[in-house]
Amino acid sequence: MKIAANMKNDYYKSEIISLLLKNKDISSNRYSQTMAAMRGMKSDYYQSEILKKLIDPNVKDESEWSKLIDYAGNIHSDYYQSEVLIKIADEMPDSQSLKKQLNEAAKKIKSDYYYGEVVRETGK
C-alpha cells in the first residue's frame, strides 16, 4: 500500500490497490491503509471503485464502517458518492449510529435526485 500511496497517476494507483485488495489475507487495518493510499486521488470514479471493493461481508467492526462512510461522504461527484453510500447502506449492520452517520454524509449530496436515492435506501 505504501507504494500505491506515492503514485501520482490515479489509474495505476487504483489498479495496484485493487490487486492488493484481491488478497483477502491483508491485515485487519487494511481500511486505514487503503484510505491513506487513496488520499490525493482526484478521480471520484477510481475512489468509488476502490471503496466499493472494500465493502464486503468481512467488514465486522463498526469503526471500519464509520471510516468507509466518512471517506464516501467526501467524494465530490454526487453520482459516485450516492453509489458508494447506497452500497454501504445495503451491507452495513443495523446500527443507529451508522445510519445517522450515513444520513449526515448523504446531506453533502447537492443533487436532490441522488440524495433521495440514498435516503430511500437507508429507510428500508
Model-predicted regions and their roles:
Residues 1-124:
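Non-catalytic all-alpha helical scaffold/repeat segments
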